[in-house]
Amino acid sequence: MREQVHARNWFVGLWALLLLAKIVLAARLPLFVDEAFYWQEGQHLAWAYSDLPGLTAWMTRLGVAVGGNTTLALRAPFLLVAAALPWLVARITAREFDRVQGWRAGLFTMLLPLAGTLGVLAVPDAMMTFATLLCMDAGARLLRSVSATAALELAVGLATGALSHYRFLAVLGVGFMVLLLLPQGRRALRDPRVMIAIAFGLAAWTPLAAWNLGNADAGLRFQLVDRHPWTFHADGAWFLLTQAALVTPLLFVALLQSAWRHRGDPMPVARYFAWLGVLVVAGFFGLGFFADTERISYHWPLPGYVALLPLLPSVLQRWPRWLRVATTTLACAGLLAMLGYYAAASIPALRAQVAGEKGYPHNFAGWTPLAAAVRDLRASMPADTRIVADNFKAGAELGFALGDANIAVLPHPLNVKHGRAPQLRLWGLDAIDRSHFGAHPLLLVVGASEVELKNLPAQYHALCARLGPLPPPRVVNVDHGSQRFLLFALDGEKPAGACTTPAMAWIDEPLGGDRVDGTFDVAGWAFKDGVGLDAVEILLDGSPVAHAVYGLDNAGPKRFWPISDDPHHPRVGFRAHVDASRMTGGRHWLGLRLRGSDGSVEDWSEQPVEIVR
């Protein structure tokens, strides 16, 4: 009894503390770009969308309808669902094994970093995990005896999963296969009540199927074809290391051992959990050798780990005490690391410290200063000005910040890459060119950092073809330009004339991260198609420290970008001598101020240098 009370107290204490931490993070963390698009979908209610079934969008709509247009309100339904998951795991485990193991399984549901952080973001995984647990619970009950309540729970779980994500098909397929492998499962599947539940769950896929039938299978093609190479690549071998790191190494081993130990358990429920969990994880492992490696996919196996959690306490009981302590400690560290990442992403000063690094949270950063700049510029423009974004990310994030779910978006590779182009087209928000807006003035928002440098000139010239020559932009550099936006105020009519684009530049010397003395040289190139540049200034920590000699021979940019028509080619090189002897040693940020012949002033992205003494 004392052991049970002790386990329960630890569970309740961690649950309350974790929920409080997640509420604070959900209130402070800027919206991830996918969350912003789900909000936009929620403002255009439908049964299904180009990227997902409808449930995630409906939940975002519910959140903001009840709590207002804030990040916490948007995420609140997901937080509530995520808060229920440890209790559900504890309940399932206690019923099938014992109460002490139930509290411990629930505790490790929170310590498992991928599960413990659910709800901080308004993404489908919270509901998909909830659906997995409902189906697990129903399946376990059906293995003992078929009842109307178990069949009803199965129906609700299957329908919830179908309305959550395409990936639930993996859970559905594996769960059905495992039930077929068990004699008790085959008996349950023959019962009419279970057949009705399965039919109800399958019917829940109807909205998604109907959407695809009406839109040339655009959603299916994106999820199953377009985003995956479907050719073997060795990157899938990183799956085990990545998952071991995310789950935390000892907990990962313990979960796999749980599956192995119970694979032939005399208890059908234990075998059911073991095979359900390991086959889901193994399936995604195999898929990793053929599937998409560019987008985030590390969370895909989560339903498999959740299925193994009820088996975990019995395995850990057999481990030495020091190993159990190490497992718990590592899991706590992993959970804190993931929560810490979200915390750092929510604090501009901390986020700026990793600007330019691989771990920089691009999809969380810059939206608040961008919205402030858009509001400011829009206030100086005519009342009938229309905002247009060059990609869906900026359109959705600005839409949430400004309370406008109908910001038009130009064609962009990102819209296609993330499967959002068909949905924008259905909403009538895909602005092909200037004619989409009639005679309205435009405030064009361009995410310059969303396009690789090698592709920027082509992207800028494509903007010219759609909207005409671009006027001098207002530059919004966030975190030293790791996120860089350009704002253009366009008149009502498409102007004639040659294409004028934003400036481009590169610093060849010193390179980012180089160590430099108190005095050092800066060299590189810069150009601005259509009009050219008049001057280049060198900045340190945002302040001018030198005027560069501009107009040196450098044929490289024109050779690399034949499309470029800066009138100064090939004399687009620059060099300057910087005296930073009065500055403190340590890390500083080196940047450029590019002055165009059209009067534009554009600050280029900064790069770090280390001044040594």
Spell out what each predicted region is.
Residues Q317-R351:
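Signature aromatic-anchored transmembrane alpha helix within multi-pass, membrane-resident enzymes
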Residues V12, A76-F97, L134, A138:
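Transmembrane-helix motifs of polytopic, lipid-linked glycan transferases
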Residues W15, A105-P113, D137, L158, ...:
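Short helix- or helix-capping micro-motifs
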Residues A94-V100, C135-E153:
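Membrane-interface transmembrane helices that cradle and orient dolichyl/undecaprenyl
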Residues L114, V120-M128:
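Short acidic/glycine- and proline-prone juxtamembrane loop motifs at membrane-interface regions
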